[in-house]
Amino acid sequence: MVRLISILVGLGFVGVAAWSLLWGAITYVSEPHEETVEHRFHEHPKEASFSFNGPFGKYDRAQLQRGFQVYKEVCAACHGLTYVSFRNLEELGYSEAEVKAIADQWQIEVPSINPDTGEAATRKAIPADRFPSPYANEVAARAANNNALPPDLALITKARHDGPAYVYSLLTGYRQPPANLPAESRPGQGLYYNPYFPNLNLAMPPPLTADGQVTYADGTNPTVDQMAKDVSAFLAWTAEPRLENRNRTGIAVLIFLTIATILAYLAYKNIWGSVKERKVRIAGPLEPENIARSDAAKRDEGIAG
């Protein structure tokens, strides 16, 4: 009786769940969907070509160094790189001495403790330090940015769909709001229209405003488009510094699996090929041939059939 009740209760739960899913599907199909302003005016990231795209992609070290320069001169005043250390810059091609100089000259000092008084203090950065945040805490960050919180950029390309393309599109996507944008969706005071941002308006003013804003050490023409691509590539590296190793490992695994599959197939053909060609006939005691042999043996022994 208890088992029967349990089965009935379980069936009841299954029925309720099935009905809920069915009703939700019917409602989704039958009822018209109201198109939001964000859905109408939001644009998907632009197509952006980067050297690290695809399974054979590799980082362009020169581009990463240019991107770091853009970050240092334009972005670092508001955005941190919490998970990146100064010494990681050696992977971009900087020498140990250059990294030490970059850390020592960084405009934001590292929080520390005064060994004599035990009070909070700051000190010059060293290569082992991570990039310091420009703000002491979230409250200070919001107070300095009209209550908007500047995100940390170390993992920004992994936290956003289409990663580097999104960052590139956002940096180059500032424009005047279209005339048909509803009044309630227009940017208010301290906000800027950008169709690549999810809700269309963001508190960050255009960071890249003119060609030549940064002077590249390698002589590359620093257009707004070039600077946006370079810093997007740099932020892709901060989020995935081992991307090249992962690509190489993935290719090696695919090659290994391909060879292993071929060898397994050849072994299968070698072992089972002759077995499949062999004809197997199952003969029992009631087969006419076996009955005749049995009768002959009985006669030879003088046994009556």
Predicted feature residues:
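Electrostatic cytochrome c docking/interface patches
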Residues: 44-69, 80-94, 98-99, 219, ...
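Extended, hydrophilic extramembrane loops/domains of integral membrane proteins
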Residues: 197-198, 204-240
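Alpha-helical transmembrane segments
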Residues: 4-12, 231, 250-257
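Membrane-proximal low-complexity regions enriched in glycine and acidic/polar residues
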Residues: 107-202
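Juxtamembrane interface at the cytosolic side of transmembrane helices
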Residues: 246-305
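The canonical Cys-X-X-Cys-His
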Residues: 71-82, 231, 235
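Post-cleavage N-terminal segment of exported redox proteins
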Residues: 1-58, 264-282, 286
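Acidic/histidine-rich catalytic neighborhood
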Residues: 54, 63, 84-85, 91-92, ...
